[in-house]
């Protein structure tokens, strides 16, 4: 739901079959196909419906608190210029944060949830299910379900339930039923598997509110369109504040919804460098990471073809990240296409690097970022000192870090 694409654009996908080049599609059980086609029909009806867009805009403004601020990170910029000077480089770009952490519920997830709950209402559904990793999508789903009077079930890996207890409590307060998933490693992939099983069983009355830009078509498209408000706002805001577009934009990539939301409105701005940050975990030499585009290969998972972490037999591998929201062995199909097209660079950041960026941002900005966002900030910390002072970098601060304080305390050997 941003500006129209142009000829020879990077923004024209997906095609009618839901494909971005060789990625995407809808690989689902026969039981689900009629529901997927019905969802696509309703999505095609509402995506250009002015009444639907007006209702979504009203909710986004008065309920979620949009537009989110584009904030000049003066403290971080000053720190990185000092680093640049100490290295004899004499540079250091200006760093801006797109403050999705200031939204209602504390992250970008509310953008998508508001859009999808309105779609569920149009479709006449009576029950909402969702999957969650870090818990932010679960909280946002429970929030919109409460706002519109829907019962809500959230599937969450048992590992994530343990490391994201504040968000589990928030979901329950909002009236959602949280179902821990013990299969596999008990993380986001396993939660999504269980949500899909629920959906197959309850196809008539249930709406599956997917939280990321993955899954079968039309989910990658509709999630992207609901999240593209991030980039649409950021593009207008930087033009107003600096009089020009940024040189570089950076966002963390798990499934990839916050990233594609920032990236999509900038894809045809050829002078804007776009960088997606994957979870490098404990390093790409082993298997303890979630860098599917740096260390994976194409395959099918959760209804779409995309880059995955898989073994030689095509079995999906369980990755690792300090960040529950990046702990997913795949990525949205549009990201896979953007990787192969060369338009977007995808770079891994290690757990330790993200943790250092988390601490640095807290100290120099007075902002506690989500560990997902800290991955993106960590890459900015690497590249900004070597850039010129008149250059501009936008980092998507996708969520706040309240949910991560227990994880960080444990990593730092502190007791809360």
Swiss-Prot record:
NCBIfam families: trpB. Pathway: Amino-acid biosynthesis; L-tryptophan biosynthesis; L-tryptophan from chorismate: step 5/5. Its cofactor is pyridoxal 5'-phosphate. It comes from the Bacteria. InterPro entries: Trp_synth_b_CS, Trp_synth_beta, Trp_synth_beta/beta-like, TrpB-like_PALP, TrpB-like_PALP_sf. Belongs to the TrpB family. Keywords: Amino-acid biosynthesis, Aromatic amino acid biosynthesis, Lyase, Pyridoxal phosphate, Tryptophan biosynthesis. Tetramer of two alpha and two beta chains. Its EC number is 4.2.1.20. The gene is trpB. This is Tryptophan synthase beta chain. SUPFAM superfamilies: Tryptophan synthase beta subunit-like PLP-dependent enzymes (SSF53686). It holds the Pfam family PALP. GO terms for cellular component: cytoplasm. The beta subunit is responsible for the synthesis of L-tryptophan from indole and L-serine. It catalyses: (1S,2R)-1-C-(indol-3-yl)glycerol 3-phosphate + L-serine = D-glyceraldehyde 3-phosphate + L-tryptophan + H2O. The modification N6-(pyridoxal phosphate)lysine is found at residue 109. GO terms for molecular function: tryptophan synthase activity.
